[in-house]
Amino acid sequence: MADQQLGVLKALDVAKTQLYHFTAIVIAGMGFFTDAYDLFCVSLVTKLLGRLYYFNPTSAKPGSLPPHVAAAVNGVALCGTLAGQLFFGWLGDKLGRKKVYGITLIMMILCSVASGLSLGNSAKGVMTTLCFFRFWLGFGIGGDYPLSATIMSEYANKKTRGAFIAAVFAMQGVGILAGGFVALAVSSIFDKKFPSPTYEQDRFLSTPPQADYIWRIIVMFGALPAALTYYWRMKMPETARYTALVAKNIKQATADMSKVLQTDLELEERVEDDVKDPKKNYGLFSKEFLRRHGLHLLGTTSTWFLLDIAFYSQNLFQKDIFSAIGWIPKAATMNAIHEVFKIARAQTLIALCSTVPGYWFTVAFIDIIGRFAIQLMGFFMMTVFMFAIAFPYNHWILPDNRIGFVVMYSLTFFFANFGPNATTFIVPAEIFPARLRSTCHGISAATGKAGAIVGAFGFLYAAQPQDKTKTDAGYPPGIGVKNSLIMLGVINFVGMLFTFLVPEPKGKSLEELSGEAEVDK
């Protein structure tokens, strides 16, 4: 029963919202700011990379990345993230959250800078070094998912735990926004300093050599917020739940949380034996785990997988959709710097109007209406809006209807973030036992990233027109944007069905949810 919960953990559960909660949100949230900035900023500069390194003076179109290179540049960080989520999720349960937390941040800082310094005498050399460092950048980013979620859930009180974890995740939206603003600022400065003709006017001069610095500056900027929070990450004590329930050191947990809560907590020697009860030490691959949490893990992994197919395929390739409906002019009518500016402006507008508000709506309502309701509603609304865009797609691409298209498209993003994009991150940090919490969150997140890889790689090919003569250079014919959007709508609907496997953690302590507060079974 819940009354068997340790006093130190009960104190955390009923603690009033105070400064240390907000400090933890900022420290963990800045990691997510960097995560989102790094993962999405590359979508702002892929067109520029094509112009710089794959320029063909005989072509009527500016240079573009060959399909395999575009897939690698867009997807390699996602592959690294998947590996990092599994590895650091497991390590966070083995060594402790705090010990591993600094390593992920150092990796992010070093690899962000190294990505921007990618060198080589040829296009192949630059792309190879860029992909190498982006893989390891993703590896560090991957570690931040299970660790940030677990740390925040273990520090929070049960009344506002959902909002605190959601606030950490909402920093992703700010990171995406920052990526857009940095790209806008950098491209504007370079445009004033190095004015250039359009590609149609002069194929050679439309991409000034100085444009090579633009993508490097944008990519490297991601290291700055991570570097600023490193000191504070190292100052955080280990979470009481890890120290007491996994490391079995209730004395240390009580001392740590007395400092954090700024109050004297009584040490409970009588429950030391209960914490060491072998009945509560079942492993991840045991029958007991399968009985208690098997369906929960299936629910968290499947919903995250399906959500990320839709979310990442849209997000990474927004610029292609905007080009298709004419929101971004034809590449040949712009120079390289203007193209970066126009893509950044379009993505920033979408983020400002839909992505960021969606995250903060989740923060506001998650502890009122619950995780289950938000996730179910989000998947349902994403399905509705995706079909509303897809079936009359030929109507939306008419010039008079473009604003309507962008509104509908923005609403799918709003309900992704005021919906499953936030809840799939929050719930796995709440419903599993402390000794497996980080691992299970890592498994759930990695399955999500597998979906992101399917979306990122698959959408590149699927969205190509069915007419061979209209495909991008090097791509085979696909099923077209309309059919791709219908597929994404179906995926969202299936995600809604799998949501019924996920329990509702609202208002319950972590020990109640995981079964760690039960003495006899």
UniProtKB/Swiss-Prot annotation:
InterPro entries: MFS_dom, MFS_sugar_transport-like, MFS_trans_sf, Phos_permease
UniProt GO MF annotations: phosphate transmembrane transporter activity; symporter activity
Note: Although related to the sugar transporter family, it does not transport sugars.
Membrane topology classification: Multi-pass membrane protein
Protein name, UniProt field: Probable inorganic phosphate transporter 1-3
Membrane spanning stretches: 25-45, 71-91, 100-120, 132-152, 162-182, 212-232, 293-313, 349-369, 372-392, 403-423, 442-462, 485-505
The family this protein is said to belong to: Belongs to the major facilitator superfamily. Phosphate:H(+) symporter (TC 2.A.1.9) family.
Organism of origin: Arabidopsis thaliana
BP GO terms, sorted: phosphate ion transport
